[in-house]
From Swiss-Prot:
Homotetramer. Keywords: ATP-binding, Cytoplasm, Kinase, Magnesium, Metal-binding, Nucleotide metabolism, Nucleotide-binding, Phosphoprotein, Transferase. The lineage of its organism: Bacteria, Bacillati, Bacillota, Bacilli, Bacillales. InterPro entries: NDK-like_dom (IPR034907), NDK-like_dom_sf (IPR036850), Nucleoside_diP_kinase (IPR001564), Nucleoside_diP_kinase_AS (IPR023005). Its EC number is 2.7.4.6. GO terms for biological process: CTP biosynthetic process; GTP biosynthetic process; UTP biosynthetic process. This is Nucleoside diphosphate kinase.
Length: 149
């Protein structure tokens, strides 16, 4: 089973959308196997978004992601990276499809509700960055047979 990293950003946490976002992810067949509400330390934010260092939006991005709590999570399922990217929608909410998380709930590019790993390599790196091994669990669910057999 594939795993990916998702992070509900401060704008969604402040708007009380954690439950709505998780519900959409679970209804699509992905299983939450790790999750935590946390204030992002500056060092973690800088490491996570290191690829954007030097870009014009970098400082604002770091400031935003550390401004209020996020809900970091690991989800598991068949083709989890691609399925989650489809549910999330385009980075710019005004270009995201209706029915996607960003299309329905996002406000601007800078306030777009959720981050999701864009590849298996990114997912592995981000999961290892945000979670310790003991914070992620595996469990059988009766619905697995309905989804994957």
């Amino acid at each position: 089973m594939e795993r990916t990293f998702l992070m509900i950003k401060p704008d969604a946490v402040q708007r009380n959308l954690i439950g709505e976002v998780i519900s959409r992810i679970e209804r699509k067949g992905l299983k939450l196997v790790g999750g935590k509400l946390m204030q992002v330390p500056m060092e973690l934010a800088e490491t996570h978004y290191g690829e954007h260092q030097g870009k014009p939006f970098y400082n604002d991005l770091i400031s935003f992601i550390t401004s209020a709590p996020v809900f970091a999570m690991v989800v598991e399922g068949e083709d989890a990276v691609n399925v989650s990217r489809h549910i999330i929608g385009s980075t710019n909410p005004s270009e995201a499809s209706p029915g996607s998380i960003r299309g329905d709930l996002g406000l601007t590019v800078g306030r777009n509700i959720i981050h999701g790993s864009d590849s298996l390599d990114s997912a592995e790196r981000e999961i290892n960055l945000w979670f310790n091994e003991n914070e992620i669990t595996s469990y059988a669910s009766p619905r697995d047979a309905w989804l994957y057999e």
